Amino acid sequence: MFSSRHILSNVRPIIKNLDLTRGFSDRKTKYFDLNDLIKTVNVTYKTGVNLEETTTVESKYVDVTPSSNTKGTVVTLSGSPGTHNDFKYMKSFFEQKKIRLICTNYPGSEFVTGGLHNSYTNQDRNSYMKSLMETLELKNVNRLIIMGHSRGGENALQLTSMLSNDENWPLVGAVMINSPGFAPHKGISKRMGTINFIISLIKRHNKTINSILHPILHYFYNNLIGLRVSHGKVAAAAILPMQTFAFDEQKLSIDDLRAKPGIRAFYGYGSKDFLIDEHQSEEVAMYFSEEDHYVISNKQDAEKAIKEARKSFTTGKQFVTANFKEEGHFLQKTYPEFIVEVVDSIFDADKEVDTKI
């Protein structure tokens, strides 16, 4: 084991070379967010290898509820790092469709107090989200879709698979946006050794190490990767789930959904995603289904594709996938209306089934 002194002697030169002040601007710009809509709730959930421990956190979330005639409810799961604000561009479109939007945050984000060191495996994350959804009494809504972006995508898939085994959950679908593939992607594959080393430092919970490590991680995420984080502590928490991806195990969840015709799913990705290679995303899309796959290069393509996707869902197809050729890692920002239309079409398809019954 390395001593703290040995670690610090190797980390300090990195700080010196990085010039942590470079790239930050003193000029503040207006930032559109959903923070004025935040609500707070305490969430108690199971954690640990065998879920034998209990953790309680204070969790902030956003709940945008139509005044009447709610068509359905969609719960969003952010990436790592990520927050409820990752889905802010969808708000107005969901409101127009009378769809209730609940944007959640995971332990480790700036909007959850507690659970930092024991809530980063998929088992922990799914346990937390299930408990949060129970606390918000989402078993009582009419229709429910779980939507995840990036790291949250595989959690959306797993949760939908898991909770749909219980008929008390009104689940009708899952939406995955820029979600990881079945193997380590370029965002982590070339850095896995470094990631594992950094995680070993984070897990020491050493104040001296953290005082040096957190500024480095804050700079790394904001200036080199381009993922916005508020603090080095948040950046450190965001790295922990990088070690616990499901990857190939996602196939088990997809296979499970395939056996549940009442559950529909959409998987969308961008060819120019700077974290995930196109061929890896395409592999996931084709595993869902080689049919009902759309290649979208512009807004006109998107308009045609959403009409066809809606038709596919309403005629009984389970899975729809789309490759946005000119887009990157944030489809919920560049094509928010398209994704909202997908959610709306899944709700409509389920409504038609109910009407026929």
UniProtKB/Swiss-Prot annotation:
Keywords: Hydrolase. InterPro entries: AB_hydrolase_fold, DUF1057. The keyword NAD does not apply. One of its GO terms (molecular function) is hydrolase activity. This is Uncharacterized protein F35H12.5. It comes from Caenorhabditis elegans.
